[in-house]
Amino acid sequence: MKILVPIDLTEYTTNIPENDYPAYTAGTYALEYRCIIASEHNIYESLKNTNTSAPSGKTDANWALVGKTNAYKAIDNKVSTQTVNNGNITFEFPTLKSTSLAFLNTQCTSITVEVCTKI
């Protein structure tokens, strides 16, 4: 058995849009309304009616942090979530020094890993 020590990935590019829900903008939100803050890659749900507060980055009295957007579920440290797309999924990670790669909870026909060096 080989044990892989995970590294924190906070940013990458992907062909999957972050359009799970409308983007948060200042305003009044109804109970159970969901929105995203793309800069955080998070989905929030309003916990009260006529909610005028902004999501705080965590669950508070006004907003529940539901989880990562579809595009970022792949790195949310939860095996039970999946990034889903009809067709190919492409991820491009910044320069990493790594000797191992793991794909967990994956349903696909094939996986292609391409390692590139920029000159």
Locate each region found by the language model.
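Tryptophan-rich substrate-binding surfaces of secreted polymer-degrading and adhesive proteins
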Residues: 1-76
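Aromatic, loop-rich ligand-recognition surfaces of beta-strand-rich domains
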Residues: 11, 15-18, 38-39, 68-119
